[in-house]
Amino acid sequence: MSEIRWSKLHSLIHDAPSDSGEYITIIDSLNDLIKETTIEDRRNEIASSKDIFFQLRESAILGKSVDLKQACSSQYMRIVKGIVIIARNLSVANQVIPQNILLPNTFLAWYLSISRQTVCTPGDLKQLYGLVCQFYFNCTRTNVVFDESCFDDHMNFMVEMLRFIDDDGIVNAYSLWLSNIMKSDAFISSLLNDIRSLEVIDKLLLRGIIAQKTEIDLLVEEEDEDKNLSSLATIQLKILKQLVTHECFGSYMKTLRKEYGFASFNKMFKIVTMLVTSSERWDLYQLTAILSWTFDIFEEYTYLVDAFFKSESTPEATDAGPLFAILSSVLDILTTLAKYQHAQKYMISYDGVHKIIKLFDILERNCLKIHFNKSSGAKNVDSSAHPVRATDHVGNVITDAVILKKRIHNNRINDSNFPGIKCFLVELLGFMSYEQKDVQDSVRELHGLELVLSNCIIDDNNPFIKERCIICIRYLLANNSTNQEFISQLEAKKAVDGDVLKKAGYKVDIDGKGNIKLTADKRNAASEEQLFEDVQK
């Protein structure tokens, strides 16, 4: 277009005339330029000039302050959409110039100005919204230039998406743009620390797009990792991954729980757990970010579990279900990441051994060890349950109906007995103590060895915990004479199951001076492969 035409265009945008005839010439010129931008060579040539992007920006700047009450809105919107289409097409060839002059931000502000006026049809607004998303996506394919002073416009633009959630095309355009803008650490930080993020992440993404338009919720419930995902679901998981691996995600989760309650908090946690536990590749920054907020929640829920047991028999007693659900998810994430040395070092450096043993001890003292005797024919005090043998932490058989009913109902273990949680804790101790003498010593000094040994039994509350404990004991004793001496003294008091030691690769010997000591017994040791296979059954 010539300079005169740009001048005419700018005047038209500024004046917003009511006569539809005044728009015809400019609309025809825009259509011609749009056609040119669809031809690759011509598009590349036009996009190489800074001038056209400055002219497009000037159009948007003028348009932001225009009152459209007297305008011929249908024709005016054709002009606006034409300008955005030209920018969208040109940004395929050049992303640097439009970002450097903050053209995406200017277009967002222009859209928001138009959306606040009542003269435009819903259809026109929806089309314009989608075009702005497409343009912004093109601009940010390789790099993101984010101006924090424009965050409010970005937030308002994201919230606008709630108006168009029924349109699949707009949903896809929005999702692609959002996945790109999430490359900006500054953008994510601003988002996660803003109360309005609840509306964007929980209401729009989780309960809107993800719940209504993807199979992600079904994937979480069915735990089917082989299920094929739609392209939209893949994009949504990419967005969530960018959020989860940011250091501010923990702050968002606390706000979510406080403002929207447990249901929303737990829904997010379930999806996040599925995402983290099914992903194999993390860089050090991502691991650190996930561990940071996850470990904080783990520590908080250790305190809450302790408080739960202390108040269990009082009028202030709370429901264990929410505690168990979140604790299971947190520990699922931690044990999944614990295979990485960086994660092990992180947990060790943040007093992880002490924190894990603290929760282990709380559960050991308050939860029952349960064995369902399905073929014994014995009668249980709770007639609704199958025959069961339940013992406390010192081995006393529990027959009190009130106590049993708190922990077992209809042949199912209640959440108040925190089923499976100790398995996670033993796995974490195993990961952290492998070839780490300082950790091995810490476990002994914190009385963790006794906890692990006392769980080398069949316990339906913690399936295959015996096998996990054997693996853990093997790691705790390896090349650690002090721990071996400690175990040998327990063995002398008949406090250790000899079969457990044998499977762990040790046996008790008496030397020439009559001293009891442990020696390696690899010939009778159970293979780790077999123990892991038993655990994974």
Curated annotation (Swiss-Prot):
The keyword Cytoplasm applies. GO terms for biological process: cell division. It is found in: Cytoplasm. The keyword Translocase does not apply. Keywords: Cell cycle, Cell division, Cytoplasm. SUPFAM superfamilies: ARM repeat (SSF48371). It comes from the Eukaryota. Transmembrane segments: none annotated. Its main location: cytoplasm. InterPro entries: ARM-type_fold (IPR016024), Ataxin-10/CTR86_families (IPR051374), Ataxin-10_domain (IPR019156). One of its GO terms (cellular component) is cytosol. May play a role in the regulation of cytokinesis. Belongs to the ataxin-10 family. This is Ataxin-10 homolog. The gene is CTR86.
